[in-house]
Amino acid sequence: MKFFLGMDMSCYTTSCAVADEEGNIIYDSRRPLVVPVGKKGLRQQEMVFLHIKQVREVFPEGYPFAAVAVSTSPRDIEGSYMPVFAACESFGQVAAQASGAEFYRLTHQHGHIAAALIGNEMPDRFLALHVSGGTTDVCAVEKENGIIKKITTLGETSDIAAGQFIDRVGTALGVPFPCGPHLEKLAEEGKAESLRATFYDMNVSFSGPESALLRKIEKGMTKEDAAATVQHCIAKVLIELIRRAQKETGIKAVLLSGGVMSNAWITAKIAEATGAKFAARKYSPDNACGLASLARNIYMENQ
């Protein structure tokens, strides 16, 4: 029996996963990087230090790996770089060398899209939205035999990502970081107000809605209404991006991934409006399951 390792070290999670020859995820371990109370996040050097400390807590032991796939950059575009992914590449190389395994350099975005493909049947050409704390991308994806061959970015945020919008508003409301789950709970009792986002073709700006909402909070808007307003704005923006991408490309199939897609209200609204598919909730946050799956598929294709 052969086994396939995926490793991802993102801004806030250390992750390892193992797939077997049949493509089943048989091991999935993640450890969040702890953000001290009152802080809005961590610096890159703090993230790298924490990954180094806790990678041993998530690393699977006792598996003879045939292939290892790791995220070596945030996205599949020139100039995409973060120090945390350099650390991930180094650990992955050591794991591959120790096992005599093949080594595949992929990206954090590959991992999210591949994780979303687990349990979702998609055509070989589809639209993918990667929506997280650091990314709000609209992409055209080409795959073959379960392998992502090409990711083309069609549009992105021109300033902050959807997840940053959530966290900045959450921090202003005094909820713990990361703020997504807390805002989703608050929004259940809130009434949303409309915010206007600015679009440039398939690019979007969230800074305007953020500023407008922070002003409303300063004037006394309740936490519940503010949380509901964030959700409403993000869902509306993503629906518009999907429609623009479908019109531009002629591609109808859509798959959404990333931590923001853990929000059940947002996903329900998008599904109702567009018929899009989503990563399973357990695969929406940062994880290494998609990378393990790709390691298996790439290895099998090469045999």
Predicted segments with their positions:
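Conserved phosphate-binding catalytic cores of ATP/NTP-utilizing and phosphoryl-transfer enzymes
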Residues: 1-2, 101-127, 293-297
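A short helix-loop
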Residues: 2, 9-10, 17, 26-28, ...
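Conserved active-site "lid/cap" helical segment
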Residues: 13-72, 216
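Short beta-strand-loop/turn "lid" adjacent to the catalytic site in phosphate-handling enzymes
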Residues: 57-93
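Active-site nucleophile and cofactor-binding loops and adjacent substrate-binding regions
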Residues: 82-87, 103-111, 129-131, 159-160, ...
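Glycine-rich phosphate-binding/hydrolytic loop that grips phosphoryl groups
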Residues: 112-115, 279-303
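A contiguous, well-structured pocket-lining segment that forms one wall/lid of small-molecule binding clefts
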Residues: 181-254, 260-277, 296-303
